[in-house]
């Protein structure tokens, strides 16, 4: 901060001056040579234009998902609803398809870069996973689907917590 002040550099959040919408900017960026991901969406979402040069971002997005129960697909769906590109119902279906999927490519690069084993990686992530959000077995271990993805306890988008849900003093205490 001191270096920026002494160099008389001021940061400006452009969103204060004009509406920034990454998806609507993609076409213009492509006219300057930008390329989107041609073989499908990036891990953790349904878009193909962000985080193209860094697979490790998918680990950040996954950690957000295991801690808070939503990830980058939810972020993008909210923007798409707000900008009139998607209905709420379409967004729910899209989020359920993409949010929280284990980032296999990103995990592989992470393990190689940090010289970490897969078992240690999962043990550390599981220790920070919010077990109030995800299914656990009788022993308290997280339950995964056949693809290795965590399974959320609640899939009631917009319905709130259903009546059959056992009452707890706090969803954040285990």
For each predicted feature, which ranges?
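Nucleotide-activated chemistry modules centered on ATP-dependent adenylation/adenylyltransferase
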Residues: 1-174
């Amino acid at each position: 901060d001191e270096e920026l002040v002494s160099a008389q550099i001021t940061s400006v959040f452009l969103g204060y001056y004009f509406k920034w919408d990454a998806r609507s900017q993609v076409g213009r960026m492509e006219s300057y040579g930008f390329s989107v991901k041609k073989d499908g969406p990036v891990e953790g979402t349904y878009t193909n234009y962000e985080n193209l040069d860094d697979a490790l971002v998918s680990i950040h997005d996954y950690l957000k998902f295991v801690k808070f129960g939503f990830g980058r697909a939810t972020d993008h769906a909210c923007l798409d609803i707000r900008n009139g590109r998607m209905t709420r119902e379409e967004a729910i279906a899209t989020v359920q398809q993409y949010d929280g999927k284990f980032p296999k490519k990103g995990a592989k690069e992470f393990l190689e870069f940090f010289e970490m084993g897969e078992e240690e990686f999962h043990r550390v992530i599981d220790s920070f996973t919010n077990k109030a959000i995800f299914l656990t077995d009788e022993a308290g271990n997280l339950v995964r689907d056949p693809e290795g993805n965590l399974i959320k306890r609640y899939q009631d988008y917009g319905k709130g917590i259903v009546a059959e849900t056992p009452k707890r003093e706090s969803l954040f205490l285990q």
